[in-house]
Amino acid sequence: ISLGLVGSEMCIRDRYDTRNFLKIDCRLGTNKDFSDVCSHLHQHGIRIVLDGVFNHVGRGFWAFQDVKEKKWGSPYKDWFYLNFDGDSAYQDGFWYEGWEGHFELVKLNLQNPAVSDYLLECVKQWIEQFDIDGLRLDVAYSLDHSFMRRLRSFCQELKPNFALIGEVLFGDYNLIVNDDMLHSCTNYECYKGLFSSLNDMNLFEIAHSLHRQFGADPWCIYRGKHLMTFADNHDVTRLASILKNKQHIRIAYGILLGMPGIPCLYYGSEWGEEGMKAPDNDYALRPCFEEPKPNELTDWLCHLISLRQKSDALCNGDYRNIVIQNHQLIFERKTDNERILVAVNASEQEYTAYHGDLNGTGTELITDAELTLNGALTLPPYSVQYIRF
Protein backbone atom coordinates (compact mmCIF):
# COMPACT_ATOMS: atom_id res chain seq x y z
CA ILE A 1 0.00 0.00 0.00
CA SER A 2 1.44 3.38 -1.06
CA LEU A 3 0.57 6.38 1.10
CA GLY A 4 1.30 10.11 1.04
CA LEU A 5 0.93 11.25 4.63
CA VAL A 6 4.13 12.69 6.01
CA GLY A 7 5.29 16.25 6.32
CA SER A 8 2.50 18.41 5.03
CA GLU A 9 0.67 19.79 8.08
CA MET A 10 -2.10 22.15 6.70
CA CYS A 11 -0.59 22.15 3.21
CA ILE A 12 -2.14 23.78 0.17
CA ARG A 13 -0.89 21.46 -2.62
CA ASP A 14 -2.19 17.95 -1.93
CA ARG A 15 0.57 17.31 0.65
CA TYR A 16 3.43 17.97 -1.74
CA ASP A 17 4.42 21.29 -0.15
CA THR A 18 6.17 19.84 2.89
CA ARG A 19 6.51 21.89 6.06
CA ASN A 20 7.72 19.24 8.49
CA PHE A 21 9.11 15.89 7.35
CA LEU A 22 8.77 14.43 10.83
CA LYS A 23 5.08 15.02 11.47
CA ILE A 24 2.05 13.31 9.98
CA ASP A 25 -0.52 15.65 8.43
CA CYS A 26 -2.56 16.73 11.45
CA ARG A 27 -5.80 16.45 9.45
CA LEU A 28 -5.22 12.70 9.27
CA GLY A 29 -4.01 12.00 12.80
CA THR A 30 -0.86 11.82 14.84
CA ASN A 31 2.42 9.97 14.44
CA LYS A 32 1.16 7.50 17.05
CA ASP A 33 -1.99 6.92 15.01
CA PHE A 34 0.05 6.17 11.91
CA SER A 35 2.40 3.90 13.83
CA ASP A 36 -0.63 1.90 14.98
CA VAL A 37 -1.95 1.72 11.40
CA CYS A 38 1.41 0.45 10.12
CA SER A 39 1.56 -2.18 12.84
CA HIS A 40 -1.94 -3.37 11.96
CA LEU A 41 -1.15 -3.51 8.24
CA HIS A 42 2.02 -5.50 8.89
CA GLN A 43 0.03 -8.00 10.95
CA HIS A 44 -2.02 -8.65 7.81
CA GLY A 45 1.01 -9.06 5.56
CA ILE A 46 0.68 -5.62 3.94
CA ARG A 47 3.84 -3.60 3.36
CA ILE A 48 3.88 0.20 3.47
CA VAL A 49 5.49 2.49 0.90
CA LEU A 50 5.52 6.19 1.78
CA ASP A 51 5.59 9.04 -0.71
CA GLY A 52 9.04 10.61 -0.38
CA VAL A 53 8.98 14.21 -1.61
CA PHE A 54 12.65 15.18 -1.65
CA ASN A 55 12.86 17.44 -4.68
CA HIS A 56 11.09 20.39 -3.10
CA VAL A 57 9.37 21.69 0.02
CA GLY A 58 6.61 24.19 0.74
CA ARG A 59 7.17 27.83 1.53
CA GLY A 60 6.22 27.02 5.10
CA PHE A 61 9.18 24.64 5.51
CA TRP A 62 11.16 25.74 8.57
CA ALA A 63 14.50 26.19 6.77
CA PHE A 64 12.94 28.34 4.05
CA GLN A 65 11.19 30.41 6.71
CA ASP A 66 14.59 31.01 8.30
CA VAL A 67 15.93 32.26 4.97
CA LYS A 68 12.95 34.59 4.58
CA GLU A 69 13.67 36.05 8.00
CA LYS A 70 17.47 36.28 7.95
CA LYS A 71 18.26 36.45 4.22
CA TRP A 72 22.08 36.30 3.80
CA GLY A 73 22.44 35.57 7.50
CA SER A 74 20.53 32.30 7.37
CA PRO A 75 22.64 29.14 7.74
CA TYR A 76 20.10 27.44 5.43
CA LYS A 77 20.45 29.75 2.43
CA ASP A 78 22.47 27.10 0.59
CA TRP A 79 19.70 24.54 1.07
CA PHE A 80 17.90 26.14 -1.87
CA TYR A 81 18.67 27.70 -5.24
CA LEU A 82 18.57 31.42 -4.38
CA ASN A 83 19.58 34.74 -5.89
CA PHE A 84 19.53 37.74 -3.56
CA ASP A 85 19.84 40.11 -6.51
CA GLY A 86 16.31 39.29 -7.64
CA ASP A 87 12.85 38.90 -6.15
CA SER A 88 10.17 36.24 -6.07
CA ALA A 89 6.52 36.32 -7.06
CA TYR A 90 5.82 36.59 -3.33
CA GLN A 91 8.08 39.65 -2.83
CA ASP A 92 10.45 37.78 -0.53
CA GLY A 93 13.38 40.05 -1.32
CA PHE A 94 15.21 37.26 -3.17
CA TRP A 95 14.59 34.97 -6.14
CA TYR A 96 14.42 31.19 -5.72
CA GLU A 97 13.86 28.24 -8.02
CA GLY A 98 10.45 26.60 -7.79
CA TRP A 99 9.75 23.14 -9.14
CA GLU A 100 8.83 23.48 -12.83
CA GLY A 101 7.70 27.07 -12.30
CA HIS A 102 5.51 26.35 -9.26
CA PHE A 103 6.88 28.84 -6.76
CA GLU A 104 4.84 27.44 -3.88
CA LEU A 105 7.19 24.43 -4.22
CA VAL A 106 10.73 25.49 -3.31
CA LYS A 107 13.40 23.33 -4.95
CA LEU A 108 15.92 21.76 -2.57
CA ASN A 109 19.66 21.75 -3.28
CA LEU A 110 20.28 18.01 -3.03
CA GLN A 111 23.95 18.51 -3.89
CA ASN A 112 24.39 20.19 -0.52
CA PRO A 113 25.54 17.46 1.93
CA ALA A 114 23.65 19.15 4.77
CA VAL A 115 20.38 18.77 2.86
CA SER A 116 20.92 15.12 1.98
CA ASP A 117 22.07 14.42 5.56
CA TYR A 118 18.85 15.93 6.88
CA LEU A 119 16.63 13.98 4.48
CA LEU A 120 18.36 10.69 5.21
CA GLU A 121 17.90 11.28 8.93
CA CYS A 122 14.18 11.81 8.28
CA VAL A 123 14.00 8.53 6.36
CA LYS A 124 15.78 6.80 9.23
CA GLN A 125 13.19 8.12 11.66
CA TRP A 126 10.34 6.96 9.41
CA ILE A 127 11.81 3.47 9.32
CA GLU A 128 12.44 3.38 13.07
CA GLN A 129 9.11 4.93 14.07
CA PHE A 130 6.74 3.42 11.51
CA ASP A 131 8.73 0.43 10.18
CA ILE A 132 7.92 1.43 6.60
CA ASP A 133 9.00 -0.89 3.81
CA GLY A 134 9.81 1.50 0.99
CA LEU A 135 9.54 4.91 -0.62
CA ARG A 136 7.86 6.15 -3.77
CA LEU A 137 10.09 9.04 -4.82
CA ASP A 138 8.09 11.97 -6.14
CA VAL A 139 9.41 13.45 -9.43
CA ALA A 140 12.39 11.10 -9.34
CA TYR A 141 13.29 12.29 -12.83
CA SER A 142 14.27 15.62 -11.22
CA LEU A 143 16.30 14.21 -8.34
CA ASP A 144 20.08 14.44 -8.16
CA HIS A 145 21.58 11.07 -9.09
CA SER A 146 24.22 11.24 -6.38
CA PHE A 147 21.47 11.71 -3.81
CA MET A 148 19.61 8.65 -5.08
CA ARG A 149 22.79 6.56 -4.92
CA ARG A 150 23.35 7.66 -1.35
CA LEU A 151 19.71 7.00 -0.46
CA ARG A 152 19.91 3.47 -1.89
CA SER A 153 23.04 2.62 0.10
CA PHE A 154 21.67 4.24 3.27
CA CYS A 155 18.34 2.39 3.16
CA GLN A 156 20.01 -0.90 2.25
CA GLU A 157 22.00 -0.76 5.46
CA LEU A 158 19.00 0.15 7.60
CA LYS A 159 16.57 -2.36 6.08
CA PRO A 160 17.92 -4.73 3.41
CA ASN A 161 14.58 -5.34 1.64
CA PHE A 162 13.62 -1.66 1.58
CA ALA A 163 12.14 -0.71 -1.83
CA LEU A 164 12.79 2.50 -3.75
CA ILE A 165 10.33 3.27 -6.57
CA GLY A 166 10.65 6.45 -8.61
CA GLU A 167 8.08 8.55 -10.38
CA VAL A 168 9.40 8.78 -13.95
CA LEU A 169 7.39 9.76 -17.02
CA PHE A 170 9.27 8.93 -20.22
CA GLY A 171 12.87 8.57 -21.36
CA ASP A 172 15.30 5.78 -20.48
CA TYR A 173 14.26 4.22 -17.17
CA ASN A 174 17.65 2.50 -16.94
CA LEU A 175 19.21 5.83 -15.98
CA ILE A 176 17.78 5.56 -12.47
CA VAL A 177 16.54 1.95 -12.22
CA ASN A 178 19.76 0.06 -11.67
CA ASP A 179 21.88 -1.58 -8.99
CA ASP A 180 23.10 1.76 -7.63
CA MET A 181 19.91 3.82 -7.49
CA LEU A 182 16.26 2.74 -7.60
CA HIS A 183 14.71 -0.72 -7.69
CA SER A 184 11.82 0.32 -9.92
CA CYS A 185 9.96 3.25 -11.46
CA THR A 186 6.57 4.06 -12.92
CA ASN A 187 6.01 2.64 -16.41
CA TYR A 188 4.25 5.53 -18.11
CA GLU A 189 5.03 4.18 -21.57
CA CYS A 190 2.86 1.12 -21.00
CA TYR A 191 0.26 3.13 -19.08
CA LYS A 192 -0.29 5.22 -22.20
CA GLY A 193 -0.21 2.20 -24.48
CA LEU A 194 -2.76 0.37 -22.37
CA PHE A 195 -5.65 2.81 -22.72
CA SER A 196 -4.82 4.22 -26.17
CA SER A 197 -4.51 0.72 -27.69
CA LEU A 198 -8.07 0.01 -26.58
CA ASN A 199 -9.47 3.40 -27.52
CA ASP A 200 -7.90 3.22 -30.98
CA MET A 201 -8.58 -0.52 -31.30
CA ASN A 202 -4.93 -1.00 -32.13
CA LEU A 203 -3.37 -3.55 -29.77
CA PHE A 204 -0.18 -3.38 -31.82
CA GLU A 205 0.76 -0.34 -29.70
CA ILE A 206 0.81 -2.04 -26.30
CA ALA A 207 2.29 -5.20 -27.86
CA HIS A 208 5.13 -3.12 -29.32
CA SER A 209 5.80 -1.37 -26.00
CA LEU A 210 5.85 -4.64 -24.06
CA HIS A 211 8.17 -6.32 -26.55
CA ARG A 212 10.41 -3.24 -26.74
CA GLN A 213 10.74 -3.29 -22.97
CA PHE A 214 10.72 -6.97 -22.03
CA GLY A 215 11.14 -9.07 -25.17
CA ALA A 216 13.97 -11.50 -25.87
CA ASP A 217 15.71 -9.53 -28.64
CA PRO A 218 19.10 -8.01 -27.74
CA TRP A 219 17.75 -4.49 -28.22
CA CYS A 220 14.89 -4.92 -25.72
CA ILE A 221 15.70 -2.50 -22.93
CA TYR A 222 14.20 -3.54 -19.56
CA ARG A 223 14.51 -7.32 -19.44
CA GLY A 224 14.87 -8.48 -15.84
CA LYS A 225 13.52 -5.23 -14.41
CA HIS A 226 10.23 -5.02 -12.53
CA LEU A 227 8.70 -1.66 -13.42
CA MET A 228 5.64 -0.31 -11.62
CA THR A 229 2.66 -0.75 -13.95
CA PHE A 230 -0.72 0.93 -13.62
CA ALA A 231 -3.92 1.80 -15.46
CA ASP A 232 -4.44 5.08 -13.59
CA ASN A 233 -3.15 7.03 -10.59
CA HIS A 234 -3.55 10.31 -8.70
CA ASP A 235 -2.17 12.37 -11.60
CA VAL A 236 -4.17 11.07 -14.57
CA THR A 237 -7.79 10.58 -15.61
CA ARG A 238 -9.19 7.35 -14.20
CA LEU A 239 -9.40 4.28 -16.42
CA ALA A 240 -13.22 4.16 -16.29
CA SER A 241 -13.35 7.74 -17.61
CA ILE A 242 -10.62 7.63 -20.24
CA LEU A 243 -11.77 4.43 -21.97
CA LYS A 244 -14.35 4.98 -24.70
CA ASN A 245 -15.87 1.52 -24.21
CA LYS A 246 -16.69 0.39 -20.65
CA GLN A 247 -16.35 -3.24 -21.82
CA HIS A 248 -12.63 -2.57 -22.11
CA ILE A 249 -12.12 -1.98 -18.38
CA ARG A 250 -11.74 -5.70 -17.76
CA ILE A 251 -9.58 -6.08 -20.86
CA ALA A 252 -7.20 -3.39 -19.62
CA TYR A 253 -6.86 -4.99 -16.21
CA GLY A 254 -6.46 -8.42 -17.79
CA ILE A 255 -3.45 -7.13 -19.73
CA LEU A 256 -2.11 -5.21 -16.72
CA LEU A 257 -2.16 -8.23 -14.41
CA GLY A 258 -0.77 -10.52 -17.11
CA MET A 259 2.13 -8.38 -18.31
CA PRO A 260 5.58 -7.93 -16.71
CA GLY A 261 5.92 -5.48 -13.85
CA ILE A 262 4.56 -4.62 -10.42
CA PRO A 263 0.84 -3.92 -10.96
CA CYS A 264 -0.57 -1.06 -8.92
CA LEU A 265 -4.28 -0.29 -8.46
CA TYR A 266 -5.48 3.22 -7.62
CA TYR A 267 -7.99 3.40 -4.78
CA GLY A 268 -11.57 3.41 -6.03
CA SER A 269 -10.69 2.14 -9.48
CA GLU A 270 -11.16 -1.42 -8.26
CA TRP A 271 -14.90 -0.79 -8.46
CA GLY A 272 -14.74 1.39 -11.59
CA GLU A 273 -14.79 4.85 -10.03
CA GLU A 274 -14.73 7.64 -12.60
CA GLY A 275 -12.72 10.88 -12.44
CA MET A 276 -11.51 13.35 -15.04
CA LYS A 277 -8.30 15.33 -14.67
CA ALA A 278 -9.07 19.05 -14.94
CA PRO A 279 -6.75 21.56 -16.62
CA ASP A 280 -6.04 23.37 -13.35
CA ASN A 281 -6.50 20.76 -10.59
CA ASP A 282 -6.75 17.05 -9.77
CA TYR A 283 -9.51 17.20 -7.16
CA ALA A 284 -11.86 14.94 -9.13
CA LEU A 285 -9.18 12.23 -9.10
CA ARG A 286 -8.87 12.14 -5.30
CA PRO A 287 -12.32 11.90 -3.70
CA CYS A 288 -12.98 10.86 -0.13
CA PHE A 289 -14.90 7.59 0.12
CA GLU A 290 -16.79 7.00 3.36
CA GLU A 291 -16.66 3.26 2.66
CA PRO A 292 -15.60 0.89 -0.14
CA LYS A 293 -18.05 0.16 -2.96
CA PRO A 294 -17.10 -3.37 -4.05
CA ASN A 295 -18.87 -4.85 -7.06
CA GLU A 296 -18.36 -7.53 -9.72
CA LEU A 297 -15.29 -5.73 -11.07
CA THR A 298 -13.76 -5.79 -7.59
CA ASP A 299 -14.38 -9.52 -7.27
CA TRP A 300 -12.92 -10.16 -10.72
CA LEU A 301 -9.80 -8.13 -9.96
CA CYS A 302 -9.32 -9.98 -6.68
CA HIS A 303 -9.48 -13.23 -8.64
CA LEU A 304 -6.88 -12.06 -11.17
CA ILE A 305 -4.61 -10.82 -8.38
CA SER A 306 -4.87 -14.17 -6.62
CA LEU A 307 -3.97 -15.99 -9.85
CA ARG A 308 -0.98 -13.73 -10.40
CA GLN A 309 0.29 -14.17 -6.85
CA LYS A 310 0.30 -17.94 -7.32
CA SER A 311 2.04 -17.84 -10.71
CA ASP A 312 5.80 -17.63 -11.09
CA ALA A 313 5.40 -17.04 -14.82
CA LEU A 314 3.05 -14.06 -14.40
CA CYS A 315 5.26 -12.51 -11.72
CA ASN A 316 8.71 -13.25 -13.12
CA GLY A 317 8.40 -14.84 -16.55
CA ASP A 318 9.88 -13.79 -19.87
CA TYR A 319 7.65 -11.99 -22.35
CA ARG A 320 6.91 -13.02 -25.95
CA ASN A 321 4.21 -11.90 -28.39
CA ILE A 322 2.39 -14.82 -30.04
CA VAL A 323 -0.56 -13.30 -31.92
CA ILE A 324 -1.10 -9.59 -32.55
CA GLN A 325 -4.17 -8.21 -34.29
CA ASN A 326 -5.84 -4.82 -34.03
CA HIS A 327 -8.48 -6.16 -31.67
CA GLN A 328 -6.75 -9.24 -30.22
CA LEU A 329 -3.49 -9.97 -28.44
CA ILE A 330 -1.95 -13.21 -27.21
CA PHE A 331 1.36 -13.13 -25.39
CA GLU A 332 3.39 -15.68 -23.47
CA ARG A 333 4.85 -15.44 -19.97
CA LYS A 334 7.31 -18.23 -19.27
CA THR A 335 9.74 -19.49 -16.63
CA ASP A 336 11.61 -22.78 -16.44
CA ASN A 337 8.68 -24.41 -14.63
CA GLU A 338 5.59 -22.66 -15.99
CA ARG A 339 4.16 -21.33 -19.26
CA ILE A 340 1.10 -19.09 -19.42
CA LEU A 341 -0.64 -17.57 -22.42
CA VAL A 342 -2.46 -14.29 -21.80
CA ALA A 343 -5.15 -13.95 -24.48
CA VAL A 344 -7.44 -10.93 -24.82
CA ASN A 345 -10.16 -10.05 -27.30
CA ALA A 346 -11.22 -6.39 -27.27
CA SER A 347 -13.82 -6.91 -29.99
CA GLU A 348 -17.55 -7.49 -29.67
CA GLN A 349 -17.08 -10.40 -32.10
CA GLU A 350 -15.73 -13.88 -31.37
CA TYR A 351 -12.30 -14.46 -32.87
CA THR A 352 -10.28 -17.61 -33.57
CA ALA A 353 -6.52 -17.19 -33.53
CA TYR A 354 -4.20 -19.57 -35.38
CA HIS A 355 -0.54 -20.07 -34.52
CA GLY A 356 1.89 -22.95 -34.21
CA ASP A 357 2.52 -22.15 -30.54
CA LEU A 358 -1.17 -22.56 -29.66
CA ASN A 359 -0.72 -26.24 -28.88
CA GLY A 360 -1.01 -28.44 -25.84
CA THR A 361 -3.31 -29.33 -22.98
CA GLY A 362 -3.69 -26.74 -20.27
CA THR A 363 -5.97 -24.99 -17.80
CA GLU A 364 -7.72 -21.68 -18.34
CA LEU A 365 -7.06 -20.25 -14.89
CA ILE A 366 -9.82 -17.64 -14.68
CA THR A 367 -12.59 -20.20 -15.25
CA ASP A 368 -10.57 -23.24 -14.10
CA ALA A 369 -11.51 -25.04 -17.34
CA GLU A 370 -9.36 -27.69 -18.98
CA LEU A 371 -8.69 -27.24 -22.69
CA THR A 372 -6.62 -28.72 -25.49
CA LEU A 373 -5.23 -26.55 -28.26
CA ASN A 374 -4.28 -27.83 -31.71
CA GLY A 375 -2.93 -24.73 -33.39
CA ALA A 376 -5.99 -22.58 -32.73
CA LEU A 377 -7.64 -20.70 -29.84
CA THR A 378 -11.15 -19.24 -29.88
CA LEU A 379 -11.54 -15.96 -28.00
CA PRO A 380 -15.07 -14.97 -26.92
CA PRO A 381 -16.12 -11.32 -27.31
CA TYR A 382 -14.60 -8.93 -24.74
CA SER A 383 -12.66 -11.73 -23.07
CA VAL A 384 -9.51 -12.37 -21.07
CA GLN A 385 -7.93 -15.81 -20.71
CA TYR A 386 -4.91 -16.96 -18.70
CA ILE A 387 -3.99 -20.43 -19.99
CA ARG A 388 -1.39 -22.43 -18.07
CA PHE A 389 0.49 -25.33 -19.66
Model-derived regions, located:
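Single conserved hydrophobic/aromatic residue that forms the stacking wall/gate
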Residues: 1-7, 12
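Aromatic- and glycine-enriched glycan-recognition loops and surfaces
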Residues: 8, 16-47, 245-247, 295
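Aromatic- and acidic-residue-enriched segments that line the glycan-binding/catalytic groove
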Residues: 13-19, 54-93, 179-189, 280-284
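Carbohydrate-interacting/catalytic domains
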Residues: 40, 180, 204, 249, ...
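Core domains of carbohydrate- and sulfate-ester-processing enzymes
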Residues: 44, 62-105, 193-216
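Hydrophobic faces of well-ordered beta-strands that scaffold small-molecule active sites
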Residues: 48-50, 135, 164-166, 229, ...
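Active-site-proximal helices and loops of the catalytic beta/alpha 8
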Residues: 128, 138-221, 255, 274-303, ...
